[in-house]
Each structure stands twice: as structure tokens, then as C-alpha cells.
Design a protein with these regions (language model features):
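Glycine-enriched, solvent-exposed interface loops adjoining structured elements
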Residues: 1-209
Length: 209
């Protein structure tokens, strides 16, 4: 068997792998010409799975920029909103240089822009130092099989310190299969590894067919 600590490590690795696969799968689907209902359903299904991780929060302002480092479990930036209603436009550094050279294109509080580099969100005009909210994808919370150790050395489940998986319910089979695969590696059971690997390969084929 594997210990609760080993389960937690494996569970978090499996959950993170499934979560990050959403990104690559969605990018792949968005590159396919939109020509049938099957395409739309695949994109819709992926977006539904990502909805769990979409959130809104206020980033911290420091000196001359806002920072995503202050956002809980931050993974990927979505939109930047000023004063609850105005969506700022993201620009690249080379675009910003062009804007600076053209007074008629200067950003205003009604039409703000922002640069996003590393964890920094630089909003223009620079008079905007508050009232900024961002939508973003957050990382899944770290799962935890909470437990205490009994008098005989047995593990006793503790629901008060446990954290469940945050993935969509449809991922249950993939979670179990992934945990079985890693568990087989930990306990060095080639049969479990083989069965779990075949199951994962078949799931990948089914998703792409």
C-alpha cells in the first residue's frame, strides 16, 4: 500500500497534470476550423471544466504596477477591469512604444491599457493606482488526505484537515487511473503499471477520435 503522504504527493501530481492538459487540449481545439457541432462540444466541455478555476480578485499595487504574485493560486491572467466596468486592453511592449509616440493614442481612464510582463501588470494612464480587478485561472488547491496515527500505528482519516480534488466530476476515472499508475511505481508492481498505462493510452485515443 501507499501511505497518506505518498497519496497526497501522487494525488497532487495527477491533479496538476490533468489541469494543465486542459490548456493544451483547448489550444489544440481552437486551432481546428470550427465546422461542426462536435468541435463546439469539445471546446464547450473543456471550458466547462475550466470554469471551476475561474475567479476574480484585486491585485496589490506596488510603486508603479500591480502584481499577480499577490493573487491566491494564480495560474493564468484573463482580463483586467478598471472601476468595475471598463476592460483594459492588453498591449505588447513594442505596441506600447508606438502608443507613447502618438499623443492621439494616449490611454485614458475611459480607455486604459496595460502591459503584462512576468508578474507585473502596468496599467496606463499611470494615474490608475487602485480600483483594478483581474479575472484569472487559479491553480487547483493542493489535495490533502488528512490523518492521525492511532495507538497501533494505523492511519485514521481526519476529514477536518482533508482537502478534496477540485477537478470536474467527469475526471474521476482519470484521477483514479493516474493514482494507480504512480502507486504501481511506488510499490513496484508492474501489473498495476501496465494496466494503468493501457487505460491512460486508451483514454487519450478516445478523446482525440
Amino acid at each position: 500500500y501507499i501511505t497518506p503522504d505518498e497519496f497526497n504527493k501522487v494525488g497532487n501530481q495527477v491533479q496538476q497534470g490533468i489541469f494543465e492538459k486542459y490548456m493544451s487540449d483547448l489550444n489544440q481545439q481552437l486551432r481546428i476550423p470550427e465546422n461542426d457541432n462536435e468541435y463546439a462540444n469539445r471546446v464547450k466541455n473543456l471550458e466547462e471544466k475550466l470554469d471551476i478555476f475561474k475567479t476574480i480578485a484585486e491585485p496589490t499595487f506596488s510603486v508603479d504596477h500591480f502584481t499577480t504574485a499577490s493573487l491566491p493560486n494564480f495560474y493564468r491572467l484573463g482580463t483586467v477591469i478598471y472601476n468595475d466596468t471598463i476592460e483594459a486592453q492588453m498591449v505588447e511592449r513594442n505596441e506600447w512604444y508606438k502608443i507613447k509616440r502618438a499623443p492621439l493614442l494616449a490611454p485614458t481612464k475611459k480607455q486604459p491599457v496595460f502591459l503584462y510582463e512576468d508578474t507585473k501588470i502596468s496599467v496606463y494612464p499611470t494615474s490608475i493606482t487602485s480600483d483594478i480587478q483581474v479575472s484569472y485561472l487559479k491553480q487547483p488547491a493542493m489535495i490533502n488526505w488528512g490523518y492521525s496515527v492511532g495507538s497501533l500505528g494505523q492511519y485514521i482519516y481526519d476529514s477536518s484537515s482533508s482537502v478534496n480534488f477540485e477537478l470536474h466530476p467527469s475526471e474521476q476515472v482519470d484521477v483514479v487511473t493516474g493514482i494507480l499508475l504512480y502507486s504501481g511505481v511506488i510499490i513496484q508492481d508492474p501489473t498495476i503499471i501496465q494496466v494503468a498505462s493501457q487505460k491512460i493510452q486508451q483514454e487519450d485515443i478516445n478523446e482525440k477520435s
